[in-house]
Amino acid sequence: MIKISIDAMGGDFGPEVVIPGAAKAFERHPDIRFIFFGLPAQVEPVLARYPKLKEASEFRASEVAIGMDDKPSQALRAGRGKSSMWQAIEAVKTGDADACVSAGNTGALMAMSKFCLRMMSDVERPAIAGIWPTLRGESIVLDIGATIGADARQLVDYAVMGAGMARALFEVRKPTVGLLNVGTEEVKGLDEIKEAGQILRDTPLDGLEYSGFVEGNDIGKGTVDVVVTEGFTGNIALKTAEGTARQMAELLRQAMSRTLLAKIGYVFAKGAFDRLREKMDPNKVNGGVFLGLSGIVIKSHGGANAEGFCSAVEVGYDMVRNRLLEKIEADLAHFHHSHSHVSSKA
């Protein structure tokens, strides 16, 4: 049995999307047990529509719901100990839940997670890791918005954590890792990126294969299993990709409805277009993982639909089932030991 705490008030639509999304996840994974946190007047009527889910879940009342526009400091002051977001995170800290899922305010969720859950040993900054659809399947990109900027040491930690996530999710023994840069040549890029690349080249690691620098167009190609960058660049890349996917879907729709011949052609090609639309749908790869914390916290898109929220829950489920935290902590300990050994020889 895997226990997942849910911030039922999170996201643009709150319980009206969160609970149906959880119900979908429960249908697919009957061994999940949910703890919902939220305002009773809004959560209980929706939960009552799903009797099987309600029977296998627990509801705990909250006093406060964190707004999508609340500043992190404001959210901490107003919501510590009594908001649905805080209580869902705290359930992981106390051991009541194995993972937390929220579609709420990203800044508030990160601030509360860092405040409530301790950081992993030797990790200075957390990162948000996202699953990215590619021509070869899927890859992991981090950081996609936890913090702005990162030094070489932090980028290397992201690489180790991202590789651990790739092994847990994709069952790849030795994931390939690339540092996002403006070119693939070793002389290009910011000093911190070049230094991180040097560290990854010089340190022997069993858990990842460093493939050098990658460019923006390599993300969608699936050139590597894990793409590492800092949060400012990563978030821009994410939003650009999501916008491009929606633009392409709309352009296809317009092209297929422009003439009678195009409409007839669409009838015959509908299956292929449906598969393409599904592949490009951001809801299908929803769920950013907060890496570097001592507990599992999953961030769903605020505007996700029920299927999208279900995807975020399934990411949390897979993280717990594959013992992500234990693997990443072991990888980080091995890396820091290996790097200190290499540095002492230099």
Curated annotation (Swiss-Prot):
Where is the major localization of this protein?
A: cytoplasm
Q: What high-level taxonomic lineage is stated for the organism?
A: Bacteria, Pseudomonadati, Pseudomonadota, Alphaproteobacteria, Hyphomicrobiales
Entry superkingdom:
Bacteria
> Which purpose does this protein serve, as stated in its record?
Catalyzes the reversible formation of acyl-phosphate (acyl-PO(4)) from acyl-[acyl-carrier-protein] (acyl-ACP). This enzyme utilizes acyl-ACP as fatty acyl donor, but not acyl-CoA.
As for family, the record states: Belongs to the PlsX family.
Query: What Gene Ontology terms describe where this protein resides (cellular component)?
Result: cytoplasm
Protein's pathway:
Lipid metabolism; phospholipid metabolism
Quaternary structure, per UniProt, is: Homodimer. Probably interacts with PlsY.
Keywords, alphabetical? Cytoplasm, Lipid biosynthesis, Lipid metabolism, Phospholipid biosynthesis, Phospholipid metabolism, Transferase
Q: What is its EC number?
A: 2.3.1.274
Disulfide bonds listed in the record: none
Task: Output the GO biological process annotations, alphabetical, semicolon-separated.
Answer: fatty acid biosynthetic process; phospholipid biosynthetic process
Molecular-function GO terms, alphabetical: phosphate:acyl-[acyl carrier protein] acyltransferase activity
Q: Catalysed reaction(s)?
A: a fatty acyl-[ACP] + phosphate = an acyl phosphate + holo-[ACP]
Please state where this protein is localized. Answer: Cytoplasm
- This protein is called Phosphate acyltransferase
Top enzyme class, one word, equals transferase
Q: Which organism is it from?
A: Brucella canis (strain ATCC 23365 / NCTC 10854 / RM-666)
